[in-house]
């Protein structure tokens, strides 16, 4: 079984130390195989904020697949924004803005949806859509196929439509046809799992809240997701289940920070059955 810790919008510079420590403790307890960090790692893309973020992820004890968010490009330093927008990010997290993590039962594909000429809105190009689709097509049936973006590919509330990833419809159509199971994102600090219908095959958009920042929504505390993929993850012996090889399932767990307990606690579990031919 593979365990993925999905965190987002850490916004270092606004982090809460006790929440940071609670998340480090959760990672030590759950021992993820990989950590996915879906952007807005810093608040203002300052070198000290990137250093603090890197020190934090180094404590999580697993390989990290990170993509930048709009906050990870300098906002007020226009020269840096226009000439070397990702230089500070690269010093901390490497120059590969679209990393790929491949294991026998897991494929994670990062997509850089930020643009230096945009303030906060994200987009995915036709070239990026095709690159991801090619990687998905080559994946094995045993692999959970995960795409990571920053801005959401689907939303649950009308007020969040303005934050939708530009090009999301074309991306979801192509990635579904190519075999994607999950599209992970952040940006709006609101956690949810949303099934996508009317596509070539089943696909779920999985959003994470803000992991450790004080910039929380009133209705959404600090939260992260834990994904469990494999036969053992479901613990469900239902002979009527169809559409998966050997009953493989994926559990998507939402873990919220409980202030009275000073710890992350599991608050929701969504079981999904990725389709396999």
Question: Over which residues does each language-model region extend?
Answer:
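Beta-strand-turn-beta hairpins that frame and shape the catalytic cleft
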Residues: 1-5, 99-110, 140-144, 198-204
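N-terminal active-site segment of His-dependent metallophosphoesterases
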Residues: 1-59, 75-76, 131, 137
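Active-site neighborhood of phospho(di)ester-bond hydrolases with catalytic His/Asp-centered motifs
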Residues: 6-8, 35-40, 64-70, 112, ...
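Active-site environment of divalent metal-dependent phosphoester hydrolases
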Residues: 13-15, 43-48, 70-81, 115-120, ...
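Extended active-site neighborhood of metal-dependent phosphoesterases/phosphodiesterases
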Residues: 51-131, 174-176, 199, 226
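Short acidic, glycine-rich surface-loop motifs adjacent to enzyme active sites
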Residues: 141-156
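Conserved beta-sheet core of the metallophosphoesterase superfamily
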Residues: 160-241
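A short C-terminal boundary segment appended to hydrolase-like catalytic domains
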Residues: 229-277
